[in-house]
């Protein structure tokens, strides 16, 4: 299932995520099979871009690469771009958290 939420692009790898803001801690919860998205929890509230900034920071810590939200900035369903990385590397890293 993990392969279905990750797509390679010219710039890196795209990951479809589903975000729950105002959580107790930042964490990867698992895969939402119905939505075909990686479920994550973020401590920051979903106001004034705070959750988006926290998502970027969280993914930078995990992947040690540049991260950008490419769609869904105003929505809990988002797509993030992890720059300069291969799909296989992303899968291996995510498996450590699942």
Swiss-Prot record:
Q: Which Pfam families match?
A: DUF167 (PF02594)
Q: Would you tell me the Gene Ontology cellular component terms?
A: cytoplasm
Q: Which family does it belong to?
A: Belongs to the UPF0235 family.
Full protein name: UPF0235 protein MJ0618
Recorded source organism is: Methanocaldococcus jannaschii (strain ATCC 43067 / DSM 2661 / JAL-1 / JCM 10045 / NBRC 100440)
- Taxonomy of the source species: Archaea, Methanobacteriati, Methanobacteriota, Methanomada group, Methanococci
């Amino acid at each position: 299932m993990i392969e279905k939420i990750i797509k390679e692009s010219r710039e890196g790898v795209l990951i479809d995520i589903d975000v729950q803001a105002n959580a107790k801690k930042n964490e990867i919860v698992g895969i939402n099979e119905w939505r075909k998205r990686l479920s994550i929890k973020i401590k920051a509230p979903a106001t004034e871009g705070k959750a988006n900034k926290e998502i970027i920071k969280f993914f930078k810590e995990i992947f040690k690469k540049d991260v950008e939200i490419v769609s869904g900035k105003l929505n809990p369903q988002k797509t993030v771009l992890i720059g300069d990385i291969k799909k296989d590397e992303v899968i291996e890293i995510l498996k450590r958290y699942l």
